Amino acid sequence: MAFKSGFVALIGRPNVGKSTLMNYLVGKKISIISPKPQTTRNSIKGILTLEDAQIIFIDTPGVHPPKNKLGEYMVKVSEKTLKEVDLILYIVEAIDNGIGPWDEAIIERLKEVETPKILVLNKSDLASKENIEILKSIFSTKLNFESIVDIAAINGYNCDLLLDKIKELLPEGPKYYLDDMTTDVRESFIVAEIIREKILLNLSEEVPHGVGIAIERFAERENKDILDIEATIYCEKDSHKAIIIGKGGQMLKKIGMQAREELEMIFGIKVNLQLWVKVKKNWRDDISAMKMLGYNLKEV
């Protein structure tokens, strides 16, 4: 049997479960998960290597109207990804009542792309069979899909079937990455994303989306028993800084504790995490600040 390989983009409106699905399929946390929209800011690759295939999943930023240069960057990243992959997984919620404005916009964008597509109805464990069939019919009138699969990424229901459908549609090709690689992003990027996830989970309103993380230090001690990490949380307003720090520093301490615990699980070593908070006004409209915070504008 010929070996297959290829790049698979995950697209869908915010919070339909793109990151949850990629993390489940890869078997490791690669992309951050939050109930808030616009959680993913970069195209993040998750790599799954099987005996007969290597699948590189790309979790694209959620499609949304841009409000600043960071938003424009996110849209460009998503558009560029769709043009370069071998297959697109268009993810919607099986509990939807129909096609809303978000999905109408995505459908119009996908009509411009000839790449093969699979419709993925996520959260099918929460939906009736009748609703699933209705959605299949509605979406099929809008786009041509090579396959339609209903899944539940949270518990893996039908994910094996989805993998089989993906492999069927991928071309024959080489292994692009080593067998033990599950992502191509730097460790410092993963650290920044975990910290940002904890901010998203603990804070509300506009504060989390005005936050950027700079990793100042990432180094193992000589005896390799402790990983020292120093990071600066940048926000856009003094009032946001006060919220992130919290009364008596309690919120920052909580964010740091949650991030440290997860980082220790990921790296398998004790982590000494130090966090600072600084204000950099309007950084999401500042190209130099965006570059400093790790957004590779050259790619788009």
UniProtKB/Swiss-Prot annotation:
It is a peripheral membrane protein. GTP binds at residues 12-19, 59-63, 122-125. Residues 151-153 are annotated as: G5. The keyword Cell membrane applies. GO terms for molecular function: GTP binding; GTPase activity; ribosomal small subunit binding; small ribosomal subunit rRNA binding. Keywords: Cell membrane, Cytoplasm, GTP-binding, Membrane, Nucleotide-binding, Ribosome biogenesis, RNA-binding, rRNA-binding. InterPro entries: G_ERA_dom (IPR030388), GTP-bd (IPR006073), GTPase_Era-like (IPR005662), KH_dom-like_a/b (IPR015946), KH_dom_type_2 (IPR004044), KH_sf_prok-type (IPR009019), P-loop_NTPase (IPR027417), Small_GTP-bd (IPR005225). Residues 4-172 form the Era-type G domain. Signal peptide: none annotated. PROSITE patterns: G_ERA, KH_TYPE_2. GO terms for cellular component: cytosol; plasma membrane. It is found in: Cytoplasm; Cell membrane. An essential GTPase that binds both GDP and GTP, with rapid nucleotide exchange. Plays a role in 16S rRNA processing and 30S ribosomal subunit biogenesis and possibly also in cell cycle regulation and energy metabolism. Belongs to the TRAFAC class TrmE-Era-EngA-EngB-Septin-like GTPase superfamily. Era GTPase family. Monomer. This is GTPase Era. The gene is era.
